[in-house]
Regions:
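N-terminal helix-turn-helix DNA-binding core of bacterial DNA-binding proteins
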Residues: 37-39, 43-45, 49-71
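Short, Lys/Arg-enriched N-terminal segments with co-localized hydrophobic residues
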Residues: 2, 9-14, 18-35
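Non-DNA-binding regulatory cores of transcription-related proteins
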Residues: 102-170
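Beta-hairpin "wing" of winged helix-turn-helix
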Residues: 88-101
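Short, hydrophobic-biased segments on the C-terminal half of alpha helices
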Residues: 80-81
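Alpha-helical residues within the helix-turn-helix
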Residues: 67, 84-85
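Key DNA-contact positions within bacterial/archaeal DNA-binding proteins
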Residues: 74
Length: 170
């Protein structure tokens, strides 16, 4: 995937991690920086996309989602619980129980989904939680660069919606 005239690329390794590769033009250096999205974040996106693709009034059983997405029931239960608590899914119990999106696909940004599932999207630890936590921040020469990169990542992920992914607009 590319954004803003090839300013970054995303690579996914099968059954492993996805990496955002940020080139030197953004970092002011001559190498790539890697930001990893966990399997929990990637699976949450897959679940949300599956539910958006199968948008219907009735609830979709967890077993159907697990089988279709090849995610273990135990791991999937944890992910949908997180998405439900974050008001992204509507759930129901019983024979006709399951899950569906709480809103239209156009109303979910990828950033909002990943922020719910990931501990942080910050490219460095000192920016976790949206504030600078490093004791060296007062004299850190690289801090402005990391803050700018954090803003670029956040801005981009907040512009891409589930609908954009479904329509191939990324």
């Amino acid at each position: 995937y590319t954004f803003a005239e090839n300013l970054y690329e995303v690579y996914c390794i099968k059954n492993s991690a996805c990496y955002f590769l940020i080139p030197s033009i953004l970092l002011g250096i001559r190498r790539w920086r890697i930001m990893m999205v966990s399997s929990k974040g990637r699976y949450a996106l897959r679940v949300m996309i599956y539910l958006a693709q199968n948008d219907r009034e009735e609830l979709i059983p967890l077993k159907e989602i697990a089988e279709n997405q090849n995610i273990s029931m135990k791991y999937l239960e944890m992910i949908v619980s997180l998405l439900h608590k974050g008001n992204m899914l509507i759930s129901g119990r019983g024979k006709k129980g399951g899950y569906r999106l709480a809103r239209k696909p156009s109303e979910y940004t990828i950033g909002s989904i990943l922020k719910l599932t990931e501990k942080t999207l910050a490219p460095v630890n000192c920016l976790e939680g949206g504030k600078v936590t490093c004791e060296k921040a007062g004299y850190c020469i690289t801090l402005p660069m990391w803050q700018k990169l954090d803003g670029i990542i956040d801005d981009y992920l907040e512009t891409v919606t589930l609908e954009d992914l479904l329509e191939g607009r990324v």
